Structure formats: C-alpha cells, structure tokens
C-alpha cells in the first residue's frame, strides 16, 4: 500500500541510511514538495547506486549526524524533533 499521495505538496522526512530509506525517499519525491532524509551517521549503508539516485534528486535534502527525539502532534504529525549527534542541538522539522 502506498500512502504517498496523502503527502502531496508537503515537506516530509524519511529516517534511515540503507537502501530502503533511499528508495522510499526517492519514490516520495513524486508526491512531496521536499523530502528530508535523516540519518544518525555521516556514512550510509545504502548501495552506491541507491545513494547516487537519492543524491541526484534535487527534492531530497540529507540531514546526517541527527537522531529523532520526538514526533510532534496529537492526531497528525505536525513536526519532527531531531538532535545533532555532534553538538546536541535540537531542531524541529
């Protein structure tokens, strides 16, 4: 089941650094305004071809060295709080 059309013209996030994360981030750019790919390290486990596809997509922004600390919202997601693993600073997407 694909829920991508529910996110049409929205800014969304994908968490992870493997092939599945790269594939979903790339696929979701068909619907979303932008996709932020959040990964806890600065290196990825994804295969080179999957990583290159994601890196060559202008709609995908990479946020490395960050972890998710909270999902904001009651009945729907309104934001995603992430923490920089180097500085400890928190940001809301």
Short names for language-model regions:
Residues 1-31:
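Glycine-rich dinucleotide-binding loop and its adjacent helix/turn
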Residues 30-93:
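A Rossmann-like FAD-binding core segment of flavoenzymes
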């Amino acid at each position: 089941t694909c829920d991508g059309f529910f996110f049409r013209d929205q800014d969304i996030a994908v968490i992870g650094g493997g092939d599945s994360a790269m594939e979903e981030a790339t696929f979701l750019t068909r619907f979303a305004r932008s996709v932020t790919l959040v990964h806890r390290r600065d290196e990825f486990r994804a295969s080179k071809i999957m990583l290159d596809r994601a890196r060559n997509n202008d709609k995908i922004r990479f946020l490395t060295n960050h972890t998710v600390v909270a999902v904001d919202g009651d009945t729907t997601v309104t934001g995603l709080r992430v923490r920089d693993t180097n500085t400890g600073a928190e940001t809301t997407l």
